[in-house]
């Protein structure tokens, strides 16, 4: 398997899940840095969804002509064996917006 890269979208099998975690096999955005992706067996991803919610932790995205959101409130580490195949890469603008939103989420004021 190729190492997943930051800002790439991979189809990932997220089941089994518990409670309110986003479930099923779906596109996920890789948000962990490339250095970690090469060194570890796990990857940090944010699931993508076509169900839009007005949450500040959701980033709008158009990927492969489908509109949806990157669910940064659902980020998780998954084993690379859950990754099924690479689907592509988000735009530079979307990648920047995701990075800015993550900084806002984890910065203390």
Where are these regions (language model features)?
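Conserved functional hotspots at enzyme active or ligand-binding sites that engage polyanionic ligands
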Residues: 1-109
